[in-house]
Design a protein with these regions (language model features):
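A structural "domain/chain start" motif
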Residues: 26-98, 192
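Compositionally biased, intrinsically disordered linkers/stalks adjacent to structured regions
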Residues: 174-192
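Bacterial N-terminal signal peptides that target proteins for export
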Residues: 2-12
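Sec/Tat-exported extracytoplasmic proteins
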Residues: 79-84, 96-108, 129, 157, ...
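Surface-exposed short loop/turn segments
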Residues: 102, 106-159, 165-167, 171
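Bacterial N-terminal signal peptides
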Residues: 12-20
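Short alpha-helix boundary/capping segments
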Residues: 88, 92, 168-176
Length: 192
C-alpha cells in the first residue's frame, strides 16, 4: 500500500464514522421516538402530525412544512383550548391568547383582533402542573410549575404552515405558559 493510501485510509474511516453517527443522531430527533412522546398523562390529540415534529431550536418540537413564515405579516390568535386535566390546565389556557399575542408582536408580527389575517394561531394546553409544597422546597427547579402547549398555525386558505409542541417551567403556572409561548413565538419567527 502506498504511503498516500495509508494516510488516506484513517481519514476516510473517520469521515464515514462521523457521517453514520450524524445520521443516527438525526433519527433520534423525531418526537415520536423521544421520551416526551412516552408520557402517558400528556394527550397527543390536538396536532394532526405528531410524526412530523422534529427537535426545534427555541421550542421543543416543531414542524414547518413550508419553511420559515417571514412572508406573513398579520396574525390572529384564537382563545386557547385545553385537553389537559385539572384546574391548572384551564388556568394556563386562559392566559394563552394574551401571551401569544404579546410575544408575536415582539417578534415583529402585526396582531389583529378580527380576520382576515395572514396567519391564524390555535393553541392547546395539554398539561399543566403545580407541585406540592414539599416538592417545591426540596425539588429545586425540577419541581417548579410547568405547562405543555401545542400550536397549530394556518395561513389564509386554512392550510397548516406550522405545528409546535413545547413544555416549559416557571415560578408559577402563569409564568410557565409565558415562558413557553415566548419560545414558540421565536420559533415561529425563525421557522425552526
Amino acid at each position: 500500500m502506498s504511503h498516500f493510501a495509508r494516510k488516506l485510509y484513517p481519514l476516510a474511516s473517520v469521515v464515514l464514522f462521523l457521517f453514520a453517527m450524524s445520521t443516527a443522531l438525526r433519527a433520534d430527533q423525531k418526537f415520536l421516538s423521544s421520551d416526551d412522546a412516552k408520557e402517558h398523562d400528556e394527550p397527543q390529540k390536538f396536532l394532526p402530525d405528531y410524526d412530523k415534529l422534529v427537535k426545534g431550536k427555541d421550542a421543543d418540537w416543531v414542524y414547518f412544512p413550508e419553511g420559515d413564515l417571514k412572508k406573513y405579516k398579520t396574525v390572529l390568535v384564537k382563545e386557547f383550548e385545553h385537553n389537559g386535566k385539572g384546574r391548572e390546565a384551564k388556568e394556563a389556557a386562559s392566559y394563552g391568547k394574551e401571551y401569544m399575542e404579546q410575544w408575536l408582536q415582539k417578534q415583529g408580527f402585526d396582531v389583529v383582533e378580527k380576520g382576515p389575517a395572514d396567519l391564524t394561531v390555535e393553541g392547546n394546553v395539554f398539561n399543566a402542573w403545580e407541585p406540592s409544597g414539599a416538592a417545591r422546597v426540596w425539588g429545586g427547579w425540577g419541581a417548579n410549575p410547568g405547562v405543555g402547549t401545542e400550536l397549530i398555525i394556518k395561513n389564509k386558505s386554512g392550510a397548516i404552515v406550522a405545528e409546535i409542541r413545547e413544555k416549559s417551567k416557571g415560578s408559577t403556572v402563569h409564568d410557565a405558559i409565558e415562558n413557553g409561548l415566548e419560545d414558540c413565538a421565536k420559533s415561529i419567527a425563525k421557522g425552526k
